[in-house]
Amino acid sequence: MTLRQAIDLAAALLAEAGVDSARCDAEQLAAHLAGTDRGRLPLFEPPGDEFFGRYRDIVTARARRVPLQHLIGTVSFGPVVLHVGPGVFVPRPETEAILAWATAQSLPARPLIVDACTGSGALAVALAQHRANLGLKARIIGIDDSDCALDYARRNAAGTPVELVRADVTTPCLLPELDGQVDLMVSNPPYIPDAAVLEPEVAQHDPHHALFGGPDGMTVISAVVGLAGRWLRPGGLFAVEHDDTTSSSTVDLVSSTKLFVDVQARKDLAGRPRFVTAMRWGHLPLAGENGAIDPRQRRCRAKR
């Protein structure tokens, strides 16, 4: 059997199993085992039965709807390649729209950037790499409440200035030392409505804690918007991803705080409504106003 024949058979098996990107996945799995790029597969001479046996096994796993990224162990996201696997949300191409927006913004020379619900560290690490490629500095903080996700994030953030904080973004008094200090805040929080029907790769393999955002998908988004109102300095910038059914709800939520201007609904690379951006305006909220922390309250300490 030739490699081309093996890939043809794999693509047919994956298509029969309901994998939309059957041919692409079959080629990527072959390239992964071959240790080469997908475009260089025609130049690869497989070593024999041992290679084809491993290829058959990994294709069978993909046919069982194990995510491609779990089988390969990595995913490309903007300028970086991230380690991913069981227990962490796999970054999606649609989130690169937030990355593109964020990298186009004018920021101070050494901005403070926060990635809330960082997961694998995708946005935080990609923003750090983007600025490093331009010779620019930043202080970047990634926040997540999952130990497993943070294990991946630490691996992905190695060699970057990204700081990781273990904390729950729904905690009302979270990190008050950031109040009024942040120049850019981005977030891809859990936002899928609880009753949504998902593909097997997502439903069976992504952690549910990283997917579902309550009955309407807005529970964690609401908490993140509250944090943005506190943490961003006047003029600070905000972007939050949402389900493609909740764009209007997210715009209304951000606008209703009366703390933001230039609230805009934006689309992902496929043209679907995907995230909302805004600018923090005016004075910082007083204690107890719009989710601000009353100094008489007990200060919450996040485990770093």
From Swiss-Prot:
S-adenosyl-L-methionine binds at residues 144, 188. InterPro entries: DNA_methylase_N6_adenine_CS (IPR002052), HemK-like (IPR004556), Methyltransf_25 (IPR041698), N5-glutamine_MTase (IPR050320), PrmC_N (IPR040758), RF_methyltr_PrmC (IPR019874), SAM-dependent_MTases_sf (IPR029063). Its EC number is 2.1.1.297. Substrate binds at residues 188-191. Keywords: Methyltransferase, S-adenosyl-L-methionine, Transferase. One of its GO terms (molecular function) is protein-glutamine N-methyltransferase activity. GO terms for biological process: methylation. The keyword Transferase applies. It catalyses: L-glutaminyl-[peptide chain release factor] + S-adenosyl-L-methionine = N(5)-methyl-L-glutaminyl-[peptide chain release factor] + S-adenosyl-L-homocysteine + H(+). Belongs to the protein N5-glutamine methyltransferase family. PrmC subfamily. Methylates the class 1 translation termination release factors RF1/PrfA and RF2/PrfB on the glutamine residue of the universally conserved GGQ motif. This is Release factor glutamine methyltransferase.
